[in-house]
Regions:
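C-terminal helical cap(s) of enzyme catalytic domains, especially alpha/beta-barrels
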Residues: 140-160
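Short strand-turn motif at the edge of the Rossmann-like AdoMet-binding core
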Residues: 19, 53, 134-135
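Short Lys/Arg-rich cationic patches that frequently serve as NLS/NoLS or arginine-rich RNA/DNA-binding motifs
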Residues: 155-172
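Active-site acidic/histidine proton-transfer and metal-coordination neighborhood
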Residues: 1-47
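Gly/Pro-rich active-site loop or hairpin
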Residues: 26-34, 56-127, 135, 141-144
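Conserved, mostly hydrophobic/aromatic
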Residues: 14, 51, 87, 130
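A structural motif corresponding to the C-terminal end of an alpha-helix
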Residues: 4-14, 40-45, 78-82, 118-128, ...
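Alpha-helical membrane segments in multi-pass integral membrane proteins
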Residues: 47-54
Length: 172
C-alpha cells in the first residue's frame, strides 16, 4: 500500500510517525518501525518522524540529555539515523511507558523543561524539520510565547551539553 502510493507520487516524502503504543497500533518500538520500513520497500522518500510525547509514552526515557542520546543510539541500531526525517515536539501529559497519546504544552508535562531542552538541543536533530505540536491555550495550538520558550530551552540544553563535554574532557 505504501509502496504503491509512493510509486504514484512524485516530489514528496512520506514520514511514518512513531506511536505511543495504545491498543494494537504499530510503530511503538524502533523494531516495529524498522519492520514497517522493510515491508514498504526501499524507496528513499520513505522515512521516520519521531514524536517526543510518543517516545516517552511508549517507554523511551528522553527526559535527559544522556537518556535521549541512548534512545537515539537504539534508533540508529534498529532503523538508522539516515531514515530519521522529521520531528514532532511536544510534552506529555502521561508518564513514561503509559502508552497514552496525550500532548502537553512545552515544559508542562512529564518531559518538563529538561527533557524539552534535551530534545531541542540534540545535535543529530540540527537539520531536521520540527513541528511544534502542542495543544496551546483553549486547544488553539502553539503560541509566540511557547516558541520563545523553545528558543530559551534550546540554549539551556546547548549550555548543558557544553558543560557535560567540559567535565568529560577534564576527566580524560
Amino acid at each position: 500500500m505504501i509502496a504503491g502510493a509512493l510509486a504514484e507520487t512524485d516530489g514528496c516524502e512520506l514520514h511514518l510517525e512513531n506511536t505511543a503504543g495504545a491498543g494494537g497500533t504499530l510503530g511503538r518500538s524502533f523494531d516495529e518501525l524498522a519492520a514497517l520500513l522493510d515491508a514498504a520497500g526501499s524507496d528513499a522518500r520513505l522515512g521516520i518522524c519521531l514524536d517526543s510525547c510518543h517516545l516517552l509514552a511508549s517507554g523511551y526515557d528522553i527526559r535527559t540529555i544522556d537518556g535521549l542520546g541512548q534512545v537515539l543510539d537504539e534508533f540508529d541500531a534498529a532503523v538508522g539515523l539516515d531514515r530519521l526525517r522529521s520531528l514532532h515536539l511536544n510534552d506529555s501529559q502521561t508518564p513514561l511507558g503509559s502508552n497514552r497519546d496525550r500532548h502537553a504544552d512545552i515544559g508542562e508535562g512529564e518531559l518538563g523543561d529538561a527533557g524539552c531542552a534535551a530534545f531541542l538541543s540534540e545535535p543529530r536533530f540540527h537539520r531536521l524539520p520540527c513541528v511544534l505540536e502542542t495543544p496551546g491555550p483553549e486547544r488553539q495550538g502553539p503560541t509566540k510565547e511557547e516558541l520563545e520558550l523553545c528558543a530559551k530551552l534550546r540554549k539551556r540544553g546547548q549550555a548543558a551539553r557544553r558543560r557535560s563535554r567540559a567535565r568529560t574532557e577534564t576527566r580524560s
